[in-house]
């Protein structure tokens, strides 16, 4: 496994792979790798001959200095895990390499609409930071395929939109969320939890499943459902942050045409901000079914 910190070095190596006719898959990470990240690596291997992983804690996407400073950094352990997965190349740049003139003078990439709703509304600039670094890493690595976790549902939607709008010749693969045995979504931030907090953390996923069950049971009073869910989180000692129930395709409000909804949740627990999501298939009556029901009612 080769490790590069300089842009020119990794570019030359990727060019060599391409000259050899090898397909390149890319997995961008911020390090502190867990089984969820390794699942992305394994999925990337299914699509390409070579897997490149980046480890870079991107300061542009953090809206709080303490969150950036507290983000776990475990480079040696990360490299050991990636070596065990047979990764060919790891890119480990510093902020000075990625942003040589600082953040204030950095050209940025902004996806309008999707970047400013939901989580983007409460974290101004967050998705701009994500799309800027992902775009820059794509330009450096020049992958054929890139894998992202579905746990960051809105982020994946934003990246897909960026790739589509900018006509990037990169296939984006969404990989299902990997969970602990108790249902908690795997996350680098889980390491910030105390033993007691870790025991309470699965309540987020359980509450999400309760919302899903309520929706499948026919509840469409979403504001009331969200209020009940927040009460469940508070009762378990979590501080609710955001809960959204939206159309999974557009991330807009659910309409009669919505065929799949998504529950987007976040909550604070100690020093950690936990996030999760779940899609819910909606029952949509066809015109034939509606007509049949109307005829039955008339006959009665």
UniProtKB/Swiss-Prot annotation:
Positions bound to ATP: 30-37, 149-152, 178, 186-189
Entry-linked Pfam families: Pantoate_ligase (PF02569)
Reaction(s) catalysed (UniProt annotation): (R)-pantoate + beta-alanine + ATP = (R)-pantothenate + AMP + diphosphate + H(+)
Top EC category: ligase
GO molecular function, one term: pantoate-beta-alanine ligase activity
Highest rank taxon of the organism: Bacteria
Keywords, comma-separated and alphabetical: ATP-binding, Cytoplasm, Ligase, Nucleotide-binding, Pantothenate biosynthesis
Single GO cellular component term: cytosol
Protein residues bound to (R)-pantoate: 61, 155
InterPro entries: Cyt_trans-like, Pantoate_ligase, Pantoate_ligase_C, Rossmann-like_a/b/a_fold
Catalytic center residues: 37
Record's subcellular location: Cytoplasm
EC assignment: 6.3.2.1
Binding, beta-alanine: 61
GO biological process, one term: pantothenate biosynthetic process
Pathway: Cofactor biosynthesis; (R)-pantothenate biosynthesis; (R)-pantothenate from (R)-pantoate and beta-alanine: step 1/1
Subunit structure: Homodimer.
Described function: Catalyzes the condensation of pantoate with beta-alanine in an ATP-dependent reaction via a pantoyl-adenylate intermediate.
HAMAP family: PanC
Family: Belongs to the pantothenate synthetase family.
NCBIfam families, sorted: cyt_tran_rel, panC
More info: The reaction proceeds by a bi uni uni bi ping pong mechanism.
Name of the featured protein: Pantothenate synthetase
Gene (UniProt): panC
């Amino acid at each position: 496994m080769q490790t590069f910190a300089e842009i020119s070095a990794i570019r030359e190596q990727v060019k060599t792979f391409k000259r050899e006719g090898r397909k390149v898959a890319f997995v961008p990470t911020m390090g502190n790798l867990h089984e969820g990240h390794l699942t992305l690596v394994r999925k990337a291997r299914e699509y390409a001959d070579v897997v490149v992983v980046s480890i870079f804690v991107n300061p542009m996407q953090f809206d709080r200095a303490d969150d950036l400073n507290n983000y776990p950094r475990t480079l040696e352990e990360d490299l050991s895990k990636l070596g065990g997965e047979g990764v060919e190349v790891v890119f480990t740049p510093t902020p000075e390499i990625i942003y040589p003139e600082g953040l204030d003078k950095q050209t940025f990439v902004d996806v309008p609409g999707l970047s400013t709703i939901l989580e983007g509304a409460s974290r101004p600039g967050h998705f701009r930071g994500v799309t800027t670094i992902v775009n820059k890493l794509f330009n450096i690595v020049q992958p054929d395929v890139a894998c992202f976790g579905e746990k960051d549902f809105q982020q994946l939607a934003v990246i897909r939109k960026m790739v589509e709008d900018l006509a990037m010749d990169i296939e984006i693969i969404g990989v299902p969320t990997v969970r602990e045995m108790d249902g908690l979504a795997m996350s680098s931030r889980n390491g910030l939890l105390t033993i007691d907090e870790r025991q309470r953390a699965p309540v987020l996923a359980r509450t999400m499943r309760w919302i899903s069950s309520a929706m499948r049971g026919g509840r469409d009073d979403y504001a009331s459902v969200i209020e009940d869910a927040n009460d469940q989180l508070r009762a378990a000692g979590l501080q609710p942050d955001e809960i959204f129930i939206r159309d999974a395709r557009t991330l807009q409000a659910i309409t009669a045409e919505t065929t799949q909804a998504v529950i987007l949740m976040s909550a604070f627990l100690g020093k950690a901000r936990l996030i999760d999501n779940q899609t819910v298939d909606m029952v949509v009556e066809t015109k034939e079914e509606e007509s049949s029901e109307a005829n039955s009612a008339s006959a009665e």
